[in-house]
Amino acid sequence: MPIANCQLPIVNYQFLSLRIMPAIKVAILDLYEGHPNQGMRCIREILNQYGESNHLDLAWDEFDVRLKKEVPDMSYDIFISSGGPGSPLESEGSEWEKAYFHWLQQVIKWNNDPANLKKKHVFFICHSFQLACRHLKIGKVTKRKSTAFGVFPVHMLIEGQDEVTFEGLNDPFYAVDSRDYQVVQPHHNRLRDLGGKVLCIEKDRPHVPFERAIMAIRFTDYMIGTQFHPEADAIGMSLHLQTEERKKVVIESHGYDKWESMIEHLNDPDKILWTYSHILPNFLDHAQHEIQG
């Protein structure tokens, strides 16, 4: 019996062109000079969480700026420059600072070149923020009358309300602050030349005859910095402050009431946890969308 002729149905296959995204390279510039700190841990955790929640191939390297004079090259897409101990004034002229400012000038040069379509995005934290302000002549870096340590309200200016990095924040929002130095007297003409603006200031205290510190600046379209610590992790920092050793240090330096108020603020979901979950993730969002087009 002959086998019947079978005609296979014609199937039209549509092949989807899959766009393979390259890894986003992040450089963390460590300015802690080997001192024990929570900042680096917090930055790593934010990058881990951000990469996982957004299904991104996020790779990073760390550079010991002050001890080893290490700085990244221009193969990185995003730079996060940490806080650190000591005076942002006394390091002037040091070898590590020369290397750091050379890196910063390379970033600015790259971003100013129209041929470079993918720009480099930078976030400066605390000590790095003060160094950038001094180097770029954005404002006056001075020693405070007393140490700022604790959880404080940060007040947005009009420019800050339109800042993509602050999207979703209240006004004021709360941040961890730990510093002996501050940036005051912004040079507005210099900021305008760079395309920058002051975004936030510290709490208004009309009864105190001191200048209010600048708490955040957008330096250029691709560089932003904060005086406070947006990377501060409420849960991790709360546990850290409740260890016997750290509790003793804080109480001896700042008093029991300050320690107790920090624990209370850290456990408030509308304060540090809210800031932690918005500022650096917003910065990474904005940067990676621009990088990947």
Region annotations inferred by a language model:
Residues 1-2, 7-9:
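Short polybasic linear motifs
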Residues 137-235:
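Pocket-forming structural segment of enzyme catalytic cores
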Residues 55-58, 118, 171, 194:
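A short helix-to-beta-strand connector/capping loop
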Residues 8-110, 234, 238, 244, ...:
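N-terminal beta1-alpha1 cap of cysteine-dependent amidohydrolase-like domains
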Residues 23-25, 121, 174:
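Residues that mark the start of a beta-strand
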Residues 86-160:
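Cysteine-nucleophile active-site neighborhood
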Residues 21, 71-75, 116-117, 168-170, ...:
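Flexible, charged surface loops at secondary-structure boundaries
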